[in-house]
């Protein structure tokens, strides 16, 4: 399993775990509220107390950062409800989704409608194509 050659910045997060042999067949795209940089995302994910991470992030300038290698599971979609039960989407826990997915955080505006600028969109499209090609993902659903 390889990582994207499109990466401009790397800061590996301690917030990760094994994919347990699960094949990558999804990509998760999240928006970081505020025009974040790849460095600020790296600083945030470097804090073990945050308990969150992403495989990649795209800063407001369009640069791409890597925080968790694709061979590892980023802690992006997991979580528990107020009773400590795993949050589920269509019956699948966030941890199970994270094991199947490569996650990407994208810089956006701080206020609704949380617009993503053209530099971020262009980098996102290139990164998605690269991830899909390397992992044999034929079709993405939005």
Residue ranges and their predicted role:
Residues 2-139:
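Active-site-adjacent loop/helix surface patches within enzyme catalytic domains
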